[in-house]
């Protein structure tokens, strides 16, 4: 592909430069192959301009970025006003195939579940479907584990192109605030956007909640085209801001939840009742009532399911078929997932690693703890330090027994992280070794108790210093149960 085809007029007026043949794209100099266009991006930790020489030595045919380097280069340099946006659009042109129907979901919590639920609904309706997000890529034909909620534009567009070649016609993906703020999602032809909720998160990246919300709103202001669907959970303080952004873009508004527009295009939750490890729901859509049994635990999973249903309906699926499909949903891995029991007490694993998510998980499980609700959790290092005491206070208020442990301490002192949590959680126990904490919590379970192990969910690593050690909450639970059975 020609340089001009990838960068447009930014490639300049020199016909020889514009006609340079590009065989690939790269943002990491270590991944450059001969013939690649290297994007020298500046970031929070380093400046890509430092690696231009290495990229050229590896065979880069041209370099694109912000202000040009002060020294002459042996290959063309293209100066870009917005290098990150240009990268995303170039990736979309280099990997041009996309499913006909694409839904993106943003919000603090629930993105993974909504993307998974939307994929499952479409699959139930006989569409070849996929989802991309925190747990990676999942489709009818492939599952690829990932570590980023929103991959970099090259990886994202490559994945989208590949699954389209596989025959995928419907895609649901997570739109993180980082991904939106850094233009990683631009160039994706989004049919509908969904919004779950907003609470404190990523305060190590966003200076305040207003900046965080504005990053989320890019989905509705810039990515979903006019006439596309905007599915918004209407039960939150910031919902009005999201609705306003959607209406300003002339999107088809669908509100869901207890304040959803059930008389119109939205979905109103009329009633919900616990039914074992499921919930009986009464819903209203376009004035018609529907009664379904949702096989999921927790009010927040109802919200997630309704956003997913809205995305499916908003992209053309039959409402009756969509609501019937809700009765077959399976929770995403590590999202309030029932993984075992001891002495009749259920054991759950949940990804909750922020204050609001921890509160919702504990509140969801309270009805299942006739005796005591137990939680094991920690907080990540090199991340928002302000949430640690908040999570400690929430655990102390919502649970009966609290064990504070480690959760990806990274470069920080694990004991200091635990101390910040414990300061707000009087009576909590400290067991730094996560496997030991899980073992102790399970060993102490009595009939009528319920245990949730929070923070990691689907993850299979414990980051200590600069090293990622293999660790899985699922495996730790299995090992603890096996040890007690032997």
Q: Which residues does each PLM region occupy?
A:
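Phosphate-binding loop of NTP-binding sites
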Residues: 86-234, 240-251, 369
